[in-house]
């Protein structure tokens, strides 16, 4: 990973072996990646990668670049949890062949001083995926109604948000 202020050169680079792996994740040798090592098993509710020595010079937004190796037509998902507070969803695009040096960039917010970044994929089942997607949709509906009310000077109107799915993902357990 690399970190820098948006539009500026990166000031920090951390390799796979600088992180702490747990819950099944491993640092493995791979001659196809730039420094020769990568982290595997960060999928399907398995594995975590933690960088706990991320030093930011000031509070604010930073560009986080994740260098990845993947292959296949399926998109991949990963969560970046910053300081055990804010989650950032990362969606890795599909590719027709193996990509040893793909890059995904997101903007994250860091505080001045020491920060932690934890990478993991909490989606181990269809139910996990549905719960995350519906939670995100509910949060965005709340944001949209709040913004509309503020923009138009009107009271915020409630939205009835109903989950069904014909029971496929058991929404009564998490909805």
PLM region spans:
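Active-site neighborhood of glycoside hydrolase catalytic domains
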Residues: 4-8, 125-175
């Amino acid at each position: 990973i690399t970190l820098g202020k948006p539009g500026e050169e990166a000031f920090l680079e951390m390799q796979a072996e600088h992180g702490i792996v747990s819950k099944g994740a491993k640092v493995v040798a791979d001659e196809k990646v730039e420094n020769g090592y990568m982290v595997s098993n960060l999928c399907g509710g398995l594995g975590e990668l933690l960088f706990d020595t991320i030093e930011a010079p000031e509070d604010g937004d930073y560009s986080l670049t994740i260098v990845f190796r993947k292959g296949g037509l399926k998109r991949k998902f990963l969560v970046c949890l910053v300081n055990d507070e804010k989650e950032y969803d990362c969606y890795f695009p599909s590719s027709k062949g193996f990509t040893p040096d793909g890059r995904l960039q997101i903007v994250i917010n860091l505080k001045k001083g020491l920060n932690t970044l934890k990478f993991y994929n909490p989606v181990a089942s269809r139910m996990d995926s549905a719960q995350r997607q519906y939670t995100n949709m509910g949060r965005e509906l709340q944001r949209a109604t709040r913004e509309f009310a503020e923009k138009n000077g009107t009271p915020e109107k409630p939205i009835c948000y109903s989950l069904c799915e014909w029971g496929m993902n058991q929404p009564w357990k998490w909805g």
